[in-house]
Structure formats: structure tokens, C-alpha cells
Amino acid sequence: MSLHKVSDTSLTSPSTSESKQAKLYVVKEAKGLPELKEKKSMVNHLKPLPPLQNDYRIPEEVLLSLNYAANAGPCPESLLPVKKPKAPKCALPRLVDHVWQHPIRRDKFKYLIDHPVSLTGAGRDISFLYDVKYVKGEAVEKKLCPPNKSTQSQSSAMVPHKEKTLADTLVPEEFHIVSNTGVSGLECYDDKYTTLLTDSENRLLLFPSMKPNKRVEVVQLSNVMDTMLERAGIENENYVGPTKMHQLLNVLKREQSIYNTVFHELIRQVSVDCADRGELLSKIREKYVQMLDHIAQQMIEFYKDLVTQRMMDQRILQELYNFKNVIEELTRELCLVQAHDRKLTKEAEKVQKNLAEALLEAEKNAKIVEDYHDLYTMQRGRMESDIKLLMTERDIWSSATYELALKVIERNRVILAKKLYLSEKGWNKYAKHFIIMLSTKDTGDLGMVEKLTEKWKKLVNKFKQDVERTEESTKEKSEIVKAGIIKWQEFFNNNLGKDVIIPSKRSPFAVALNDFKEYEKMLEEEKEKFTGDFLLSRYDALKVIKRLQENWTDIGFGILSRHKSMDGLLPPEHEYMEDIVKIISKLYREYEIRINGDNGISKVLPNLVISLDMCVFKLENFLDYSQVPTEEWLEIDEKINEMKFHLEALLNIIDSVPEGMDMEPGAALLEHICEMIQQWLLKLGNEITNGQIELLRHMDEMHIAMIQWMVNLLTIMLPDFTDQDILPKREESSLETPEEHEIGIAELEINAIALVKRLARYSSYLHSCCIGMVRAMALSRAAHLQKNPAKDRQDLERMNRECYDWISTCSHLISDIKGRKIRLLSYEEAEKLLGEEEASKLYFDPEKPPIDDDTDDEIDFKKPKFQEKEAPLPAAAEAEAIEATEAAGAATAEATGAAETATAEATGPATAEAAGAAGAATAEATEAAGAATAEATGAAGAKVTTEQGPSPSTNEKTIRYIKKDENIHCKPLFEEGIFFSWREPPSQGVMEPKYLEIMNVIEHMQRKLTEMDTRARKAEERFDEVNEQLHHSLIRNRNLERELEELVKTTMMGSQVKTENAKENQEDRGGKDDDEHQQTQTPPTSAKKEAQPTNSSEAPEDQNTPEPKPN
């Protein structure tokens, strides 16, 4: 088949007949094909060529074969045309050759349509070997879309491809290979009037032209191929890929595309002339493609190995780089370690050197220490021997001093010094005992407070958690109710006036009713938590907490009350404790408000329950409706809005208190309280320790001061004494002058006043600290039935009594030295120390006249004590005084013993009068003895000084008595001539009024003593008479009792005998014997009744008329 020549006009415009046929074909195809839009060239080498000469123009068939794939449009779902087709530029659609209309003949040229030209470059080249693009130096995966999409017109009729990306896998990115879509063969199908050709994307294509070709077309095709190869080479020179392989593949791709296009056209041209040659060329082409595929597979494997090796090299290089960095870092650290090691080595050498020097020094010092130790041991032995010698000398001198002191005390009659020492020793012992007891009690109470506070904290935390749990439950349920009612409100508002259907095919009103009932039940349960038994249990728990808190606060206040200052002020911890109690009361108030709902919960919850109840009632009426009633729903909607407001208020007031109350949140307040309690316990422990130390320090100071004052007193009281026969006479300048003696006495008095004030104040303070503790201990011991429960309280009173005795003794000593009465302690201080009753009894003793009223003492005080020397009492006077004292004591004891004997024996019906008489006799005897003793003491009160006075005669009667200084003094028993024997008459001196007053008192006392003696003798006589009467009455009673017992025994014996006789004769005598038996029983009973009045009548006679005493 030869190719027909085509004129120049035929290349641009078809002939007249062909144009008519083309128009008819366009009209036919207008209904089945969409309008083809103009498209730009898909590849750079398909751009329009520059204008050539007429001999070198591209034939029409070549242009159509090159452009039909690019200008192919999508295949519609229906063959109906949507738009009028538009003829492509530079060529008109041509009619399908007849050879393609017959299936048998079409099969011979099937190889022309099995391998269509692909614009994607897939299936005919090796472009799939590199599908990873490099954009700005970074690898980007190539998307599955046609190449050069950016150059494609946005108005193209081609079907757009959906962009796809690879999913993330475990395979590294550098191993991802993405291939282009392959190209499948074209398919033909017969239409009613023509045959259509489609590709794999359902695009309509033109059949290859079977028009005979000419040699010119072959030459032109060759020129076009050369031009395209030349242009492809120029473009490849401008292309720069990431690697040489990419550049090679780009060249192969472009050249293969050109070869594929030209080869396809050659096969078509050959097939026109000879179908067999075309088929052979097609087979050769297939083999060529298979060969390229085989090469491609080999290149793929090579590429994989290459990429793998490159990645391995890259990883190895990275590891080498990292290894190099690690080596550098390790080398750097090694250098630092070596430098540090060198430094340490130098320091170690230096330390070793210093250590060696220190060892040498230590050895030297050890030798020196050994020498010193030996020296110390020797010196200690000598010192111990010296100390033993000194202690022995001290003991000897102490015993000698003690014996001398006793002799001096007996000689100078300073018995009060011994009493002063014993009082001080007793006071010191009791004070130390109570200080230790106070410290022990405080320590035990502090431990108890710590335990109780810990227990209180645990209970409060547990109570707080319960309250918070309840409030959290109320809050959660309130939120559930709020969300539920809002949900139903929105549901019914959206379906107002409509038929309401829910997926469960149940009535929405029934579901809403169940929900509202559930809401009502939930709120009802929450309301019960603020009333009834639940609230009472909460109050009970809070009461337990309050009681526990009151226990440890009471113990704390008790500890602080025992640690007042000397001025009676409480420690600052007491005020701190009061602040804690106030804050705790605020905490209790807050919890009370929260558990009983006074913050508003107790008002809101009932309103919510009532509103829900009304809604439930309304919803029950909705069950018969299929639509939401408008009027009834408006009422429910109004109630729901009201409930929403109440629920919002409820959520805001939970876990809060009213705004009017100034309170902190419960958790913060409790934490603050715990911190305050911890600080208070620390302060309380410090206060107890410091208080004990202060008490012991003050006691030691008082002890030393009292001992020092007693030593100073003895030094001043003992006068200077020299003996001409034994000791040389001291110089006058070394003797103590009267002025120095008076100054010493004044200093002693001043020190005594200050010391007494301190001692009384300290004793009162210690007594006030311990009295509450001692009382509590006494009550506890009494409750446990222990022996002597009030022993500690008695010891505490003894401590104050010892203190007062010391002060009183000190007052007597100072008064004796000063020559006038001196009171070191006022009545108010004594009352504070001993109490009102005891102070009145001791301060104003009615039995002993005050020192101011003692005439003889006043006479003695007018002269200095160191110039007075009392003459020794004669032995006869001492004996008489002792006998008088013993006689008075014996008389008193005899009278008292007789009275007690009479009282003990006065028992029975006849002892009342005798007991009364005995009591009167006892009283009279005691009064007489007391008067006699008082007279003797009063008579002894007039002490006569021994200053150069005449000694009493041996025949004169004297009496011994104990004066206030506890020394034994003697004075004449009868003092009528006491002033006339050796002193001037009282009428001539200033003592006359005093003397007359004393004499009147003595005469009055003598008369009173005589009267008391008479009454005592009468009482003794009467006592004897009453005793005899009592004795006879007792004997008479015993006789009568004995007679009565004998009479009862005889009566009982007779009744038993007669009873036995009656039993034996009962059958014969019958009822008559019973009467006789009753008559025989009557005499003993009547005799017994007669005996009783006789005894009763005789008893008064015995009581009133005493019988003579039997001999």
C-alpha cells in the first residue's frame, strides 16, 4: 500500500467530501461524546514545533496520532451529548477507517491498539526506578498522578487522579519505592452506527489511521524524531538530578518516550502496506519490552543493593561519627580524671606526709601523756590521802562543834536555835517533796493532754470527712437532678404540640414520670440526712468531740493554774489557750450549721421535694395524652425553672456558711487549730520545765539564806568570853564594841524582815500551786478506799506550819535580842499563809498573853542580853516545882479517868442520871485542874531577874516553868515579898501601877482557884454517890434477869409434861381433858404477866432509892 500525497491544504483542511462526511460524523457523535477542551502539551517535547517549510511539515496522521491521547475526553455514563463538540485546533476529527468496523479484520491489527501511547510514562520506560523527588535537598515521595501536572490546563477534560501518600510502615523512608500506574490495552465495542475505542480510564480515543502513507511522511517522521531527540538532549543537559543515576534515568525516560511514539507510528505505517510486517514489528516490540523489563528488574535489584549499601554506609558513618564524639568525650573525661587523679595523688602524698608527722607528734604526745598520767596518778593519790585526812579532821571538828554547840545552847539557853534549825529542815524537805510532786503531776498531765489532743484530732478529721462525704453526695445528686430536669425541659419544649415518640417505643411521659419520681426519692433521702436520727447521730458525735476537747482543755487550764507567777498572774500560754478554745468554738459552730442545714440547705431541699411532687402529679395526668398539653406543660415549665434556681442556689451554699458569719473555711480553720495546738503543747512543755527550775532555784536560795541567817544569829547571840586562868586576856581593841553589836543586831533584823517576806511569799505561792492537785489526789484516794487519803494535804499544811514556826521563832529571837516585841509577819500575811482560822488561833492566842502584857519579860528586855546572867535555881525549888506540876497533872488525869469510867459503866435503863452526873463531874474536875494550871502559869509569869539580886533561901518554895523561849525557868511559889526582899518598895518607883494591877490579878486568880477546888471536891463526892447508885442498879437488874430466866424454864417444863399426859389419855377423856389442859396452862402465863408489872414497878424504885451497899 502506497501513501497518497497530501497537499498543503489537506494538512490544514480536509476536502469537500471529507468535510461533509466529517460534519455528518460530528453531528452523529455530538449526541454521544462530550465537548473536547483544548489541552496543553503534557510533555515538554510535545510543544508545537517552529514553522517549517512545506516539505518538512508534519503529516496530519502523525499529528493526530500524537495528539489523540492528550486530547481524549472522559467517557460519560450515557452517550447523550451534554455540550456541542468543538473541533480541536490544527486538525479535524476524521472518520474511522472501514477496517476497524469489521471485527475479523480488526483482530489482524489488534497489535496497534494493544500498546497505546502513555502520557504517564509507565509501562514503557524505567521511570519507576526513581519515584522519590528531591525538593530543596529533601526527599519527597512522588504522588500517583500524571507527570507535569503543573503544566496541564485546569480546564482539561481528563479525569483527575486522587492524591495518595504511603502509609507509615516499619520500613525506612529511604527504602520506599512507588511505581507509576501501568498501561493496559485499548478496548473496542460496537455501537449502533460505528465502533468506539476506549482506554483503561474509559476515555474515547481515535483508531489508528489506515490511510496509505508516502515516503515524505517517513522522512518527515525521521526529521521530527531527530528534532525531538535534539530537543530532549538540550533539555537533559539543563536537568540536574540528585545523582548521576537520576540524570541517566531522566535521559532514558525522555528518549524512550520519543522512541515509543515513533516506533508506534512506524508500525502503523508498515501495517498499512503489509499487515504481516506490522505484526512482526509488534512482536519485536514486545520482545524489546520484555528485554527492557528484564533489565529493569536487574536495575531494581541493583538499586536496592545500592540504596541498602548507601544506607548502611550512612548509618555506619553516623555511628562512626557518634563513636568519634563518644571517644572525644571519653578522652576529655579521661583527661579530667587523670588531672583529678594527679591532684588527689599530690594531696594524698601531702596528707600521708602530714599523717606521718602527726603520728610522730602523737607518739611524742603519748609519751608526754603517759608521763603526765603517772604524775597525775601520784598527785591524785596524795590528794586523796589529803582529802581523807581533811575529811577525818572535818568530822572530828564537826562532832566537836556539835557537842560544843549543845553545851553552849544549854549554858546560854538558846533552845530556840535548835527549833529554828528543825523548822527550816522540815520546811525544806516538804518544799522539795511538793516541787517534785508538782513536776511529776505536770509531766503526766502534759502526756495526757498530748494523747487527748491526738485523739481529738482524729475524731475531728473523721467527723469532717463524714460531713464532706454527705455534702459531696448531696452535691452530686443535685447535679444529677438538675441535668435531668433540664434534659426533660428541653425535650418537651422542642416537642410541644407534637406527637412524641422515643426509640424505646415507650411513652415519654411515663419515662419522665419515672425519672421525676427517682429525683424526688433522691432529694428525699438527702433531706433525711438533715433531720431525724441521722442528725442526732451527728450531734452525738459532735458532743463526744466537745467532751473530749473539754477534758484536755480542763487539764491544760489546770496545769497553767499551777504555774502562776508570784504576783498571781497566769502565764501567757493561758491566753493562747483561750484563743484556741474560741477558735474551736467557731469550728463547732460551723459544723453545726453544716450538719443541720442552717446555711440554707434545710430550706431549699423541702421546697425542691414539694416542686418535684407537684411535677410528678402533673405528669401522671399526661399519660393519657399523645402530645404535650400546652397549658399544663407551662405550669410544669414554670416549676422546673423555679427548681433550677433552687438547685443552683443549693450547689452554691453546699460546703459553706452564711455570709453574715465571719468564719474561715472548715479545712483551713482546722489546720490552723492543729498548728496552734502543736505550738501550745511546745510552749506548755517549756513552761513546765522552766517553772520547775525556777521553783528549785528559789528554794535553794531560801535554804541558803535561812541557814546563813541562823549562823549570823548564833554568832551575835553568843557573847565574847575570856577566862583569866586558861586563856590570855584579849586586847580591848579586839573585843566587839556595843556599837558594833547593835549594828549586827540591826542588820540581822533587816535581813530577817526581808527573808521572812520572801519565805512567806514563796510558801504561799507553792501552797497555791499544789493545793488543787493535793485535793484532787485526796478525793481520788478516798474514792479508791486507800489508807490515809489526806496525807499529802496534811503535809502541805505542815509545810506552811513549819514556815510559820520558823518565822515565829525568828520573831521571838529578834524580840529577845532587841528587848521589845517585834512582829516580822503581819496578820494579813499570816492569814494568807495559814488561812483565816489557823492564823487567828496562832496570831492571837487567847491562852497565852501577848508579849506586850508580860511584865517580867518587859523587865528583862530593858537590859542587853549579853549583860544578863540568870542565877541557877536551887535544887529544892526545882524539886518542889516539879512536884507541883506533877500533882496538878495527876489530879487532872484522875478526875478525867474517873469520869470516863463512870460514863463507860452507865448503861441500861438506870444509867441516864449517872452518866449526866459523871459528865458534870468530869467537866468540873477538868475546869478545876485547868484553873490550877492557869494560876500556876500566871503566877510563874512574873519573872524576876537575877541581876545581882539576893538568892532565894533554901527553905523558900519555888516552881519551874517553861518560858516562850522553851527554856526552863524557876521562880518563888509565893511572891508576896518579892519586891520587898531585895527591890525598893513599889510605892517609891514607877512600877507601882503595874504592881498593883498584877497583885489584883493574882488575888482574883487565887479566889477563883479556891472556888474551883471546892467545886471539884463536891463533884468528886457526887460522883462517888452516883457511881454507887449505878453499881446497885446493875446488880439489881442482873438478879431480876436471873429470876425471870428460872421462872420461864420451870413453866416450859410443866407445860411439856402436861402435854404428854394429855396425849396418853386423849381417847378416854376427850374434850373434857382438853379443857382441863387449857386450865393447867393458864397459871404460868398469868404468873408471867404478874411478874412483868412487878419488875416494872420495882425498877423505878430501884432507880430512885438506892439500896445499902452490901458488905
Swiss-Prot record:
<protein>
    <recommendedName>
        <fullName>Axonemal dynein light chain domain-containing protein 1</fullName>
    </recommendedName>
</protein>
<dbReference type="GO" id="GO:0005737">
    <property type="term" value="C:cytoplasm"/>
</dbReference>
<feature type="compositionally biased region" description="Polar residues">
    <location>
        <begin position="1092"/>
        <end position="1111"/>
    </location>
</feature>
<feature type="coiled-coil region">
    <location>
        <begin position="314"/>
        <end position="368"/>
    </location>
</feature>
<feature type="region of interest" description="Disordered">
    <location>
        <begin position="1050"/>
        <end position="1111"/>
    </location>
</feature>
<dbReference type="InterPro" id="IPR019347">
    <property type="entry name" value="Axonemal_dynein_light_chain"/>
</dbReference>
<keyword id="KW-0744">Spermatogenesis</keyword>
<feature type="compositionally biased region" description="Basic and acidic residues">
    <location>
        <begin position="1060"/>
        <end position="1078"/>
    </location>
</feature>
<keyword id="KW-0963">Cytoplasm</keyword>
<keyword id="KW-0175">Coiled coil</keyword>
<dbReference type="Pfam" id="PF10211">
    <property type="entry name" value="Ax_dynein_light"/>
</dbReference>
<comment type="function">
    <text>Essential for spermiogenesis and male fertility probably by regulating the manchette dynamics, spermatid head shaping and sperm flagellum assembly.</text>
</comment>
<dbReference type="InterPro" id="IPR052845">
    <property type="entry name" value="Axonemal_dynein_LC_domain"/>
</dbReference>
<dbReference type="GO" id="GO:0007283">
    <property type="term" value="P:spermatogenesis"/>
</dbReference>
<dbReference type="GO" id="GO:0036064">
    <property type="term" value="C:ciliary basal body"/>
</dbReference>
<feature type="region of interest" description="Disordered">
    <location>
        <begin position="887"/>
        <end position="919"/>
    </location>
</feature>
<keyword id="KW-0221">Differentiation</keyword>
<dbReference type="GO" id="GO:0005829">
    <property type="term" value="C:cytosol"/>
</dbReference>
<dbReference type="GO" id="GO:1905198">
    <property type="term" value="P:manchette assembly"/>
</dbReference>
